[in-house]
Each structure stands twice: as structure tokens, then as C-alpha cells.
Amino acid sequence: MRYNAVDDPLCYPDTHVLRNEADIADQAELDEFEQLMFDSRAEEELPGGNLDFMHFCALHHHFFQDIYEWAGQPRTVRTGKGDNWFCYPEYIGSEATKLFTELANRNFFADAKDEAEFAQDAAWFLSELNAIHTFREGNGRIQLVFLTLLTRHAGFKFDEDQLRPEEFLKAMIVSFDGELGALADEIKRVI
């Protein structure tokens, strides 16, 4: 499902295709280019950081710098998917600061007694982060990268082979309405 956006200057005229560094105006071609560039950057060392909002933005920049000139920068347009609208851009900074402060106050979930507790905490965090939807594109992928870092920081192993993308996406969608059980289950599956 494509995004809904209000007056999006980042798109080519009369399309929903985001302007990009390769000047690709076809969505299917852009999707392929995005994946190729993302996979290429995944082979490189990730930017270091403190698991804070700046680190989250640096990760987005790392993976999307070859695709979008605004990589790593919070979005400036209102956007949503389906009937759900994400955090308005004028509140992204303050909401993200609150969320990442809470994450730090909770010691990045490193005190979780087991995988189930970590998964529940991480599900809450990801659902909130997804509702903020910091970037115009690439949120889900960067959220997974960040989840990998959180998992490792908490002393658990992230097993990408256990990830079920379709089920994870469905769980993210229902988490928007506060239902965290499915997302916690999917997270527990990968750790």
C-alpha cells in the first residue's frame, strides 16, 4: 500500500513517486533501485551512536543517502497509510525526543529478564516509533535495523533468518491501534 501525503513537494508532478538521485519516475523501478542501494549500504559498517534519535536519523542517512537528498532528515509533509495518519511533521522532533528519552530511561531494555519481556518492551517502542514515522520513506527498514541494534545491546541475538516480513508488517499495522501482542510475538521469534 502506498502512502497518502498532503501536497508532497518531494514527489514528481502528478505522481506519488518520490524525487530521487537517479531521477527514476517509475515506482517499480525506484523500488528496485532502493533495494539495490539499501543492500549495498548494508554491507558497510553502520554509523555509531547512542541509540538515540540522532543515531536513528544517521542510520536512515546511511542507507538512503544514494537515493534521496533528504536521507536522514525528518519529513516535512503530513502522511499516512490507509486511514491512519502519522505524527504531523511539526511534532516529530518533540515526540521522537520524548520516545528516545524514555528508551534511555528504560536502559534500552537491557534489563529485560528474558526474551519475552524484551519483545514486549521492543514492541511498544517500535509501535510508537512507527506512529511518529520520522521519514517520508524507509521507516520500516530503519526500524528493523534499529531493532537489531537494540536487541544486541540487550544481550540477545537477532536472527534475521527467522524474520517473516509479511507477518511482521501485519503486526506493525495492528500495533498502530495499540495491539502489541502480534508484534511482540514476531520480535520474540527473531531473538
Label each region the model flagged.
Residues M1-I191:
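FIC/Doc superfamily catalytic core
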